[in-house]
Amino acid sequence: MFAPTMRRLFLFAALLAGLAALPLLAAAPAASSGMRLGIKGYDPVAYFTLQRATPGQPQFEYSWDEHVWRFASAEHRALFKSDPVRYAPQFANFCAVALARGEVREANPEYWLISDGKLYLFGKPYGPDLFRKELGKNVERARHNRELLKDQEPGR
C-alpha cells in the first residue's frame, strides 16, 4: 500500500511541475519570433481603459510594428487590433523626456501619461510632470529626435 501511494504522490508532483511550466511555454512566441516585446509586455490598451499600467498575458499577443504586444484580455487585444496607432505609445520603448533631450533611454511602463489621447512613457517617476510642463515643445522635440534615433531603440 505504501508503494502505490508514493507513486501517486510522485505522479501528482510531476503533474504540478508540468503545469507550473505552462506560463513559460506560453511566453515563447515573443521570444521565438525574434521581435521585441512592446513596452516590456504591458498592455497598452489598459492605460486607456483601466487608467493603470497592467502587465499583459502571453495568451493574448499580437504582432504589430516590429513588436509583440501583450494584453490583459482578448477584448483589449481586439481593441488594439482595430486601431493600433491609437493605443501604442508614441515613441515605442523610448522614454519621452530623454527623447526630447536627444537621448536614448528605455521607458519604464509604470511611468506614463495620456495627453490628447496619446500615450507617453517615461524612464523616471518625475517624467510625466516634467514632460507636461512644456508639452507641445517636448512632443515636437521628441518626434524630431525619434526620427534621428529610430535605429537606436533601447534594448536592441
Tell me the role of every PLM-derived stretch.
Residues 2-13:
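Bacterial N-terminal signal peptides that target proteins for export
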Residues 12-23:
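Bacterial N-terminal signal peptides
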Residues 24-156:
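Charged, low-complexity intrinsically disordered segments
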Residues 5, 23-24:
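Residue-level detector of intrinsically disordered terminal segments
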